[in-house]
């Protein structure tokens, strides 16, 4: 849906659909894989902290047989689609259109605040979670400013 709406806006603005931060010629290139490594490092750091403080326990592997391969692969595909959708919506068209009209920092703060507020719709989110989501959103906006691409954030 996000790609369709962005495509309509791109037609109206006479721009290519990939001009909003996801250039096709950079798909799954270096920025994407650097983002994958950065994301995995953050997840590992957070998980280690949770294990050390007792906030998480591992009781074993619940998957067996073909599910041991298919479930993680489906999860990876799902997370990739979430990444593309969220980034293209918040840091693609919205950030870049506001950036052209209002400047980078107002655009970054507005889109990041919206991103964080919408996460309040998820059950069990708290102020710390929303603060971390806001900080992550700003980091991603800055990465778009530096690289001109959303591929690092998608990774």
Residue spans of the language-model regions?
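Membrane-helix interface segments
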Residues: 16, 27-29, 68, 101-106, ...
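Membrane-interface helix/loop boundary segments of multi-pass membrane proteins
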Residues: 85-110, 142-150
